[in-house]
Amino acid sequence: MVPRTEIAVFKTDHHSDFRNDYKTRAWEVARATSAAPTYLKGHEHTPSGRIFIDGGVWANNPVMVALVDVLSAYEISPDQIDILSIGTGNPPFELRPKAALGGAVSWRAAIKAAMFLTTDNATAQAKLLLGPDKCLRIEPVGGDGTIEMDDYDRALSVLPTSADRDFAASKAELARFFAETASPRERHHSLS
C-alpha cells in the first residue's frame, strides 16, 4: 500500500490566511524539512497530525515555491522582486547512449539526475518570470556538488574552500542583496 501524500509548506504569518504554522518552533520546521527519507525517519508534527519528509523530494530547489508564495500573498509586481538562491550542489549529468535504450538498471542514474534537473528547471522558470538579472543562484559545481549527505569528513575538507571560491566569484552580484536594510515582514497573528 502506498501512503497518501500531501504537499505542505510551513509558512510564517505574513498573510492573514496563514494562522497556524507560525506557532511551530524553528527547530521543528528545520527537522521536518530535512527528514531525508534515506537517512532519517519522517518528522511527526503533533499539532497537525502529519508526518513530514524532506522538502527536496518534491522541490529540491524551492525558488518557485517562494516566488509563487510572494506573488500570491502580496500586491507586488515581479520587477520588485530579487531572489538570492543558494544551492547544495548540482553535479553534472550526461545520459549515456546505452542508458537511453531503457531498463531499470540503466535508468537508475537518470532517476537520481532527475532531481537535479528539476533544480535547474526551477531556476530557469524564476529567471523567465523575473528576468535573468533578478535571480542569482549560487550552486557548488563539479565534484563539490557530489558530497554524500553523511560524508562529514569530505564536506569539511571541500565545502569551506568551495564557499570561498563561490563567494569571490559572486561578490559583486551578492553586494546588491545587502546594500540596504529590508523592511520588517508583515505579521498578522504573532507579536512584532
Predicted regions and their residues:
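Conserved catalytic cores and adjacent C-terminal regulatory segments
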Residues: M1-S192
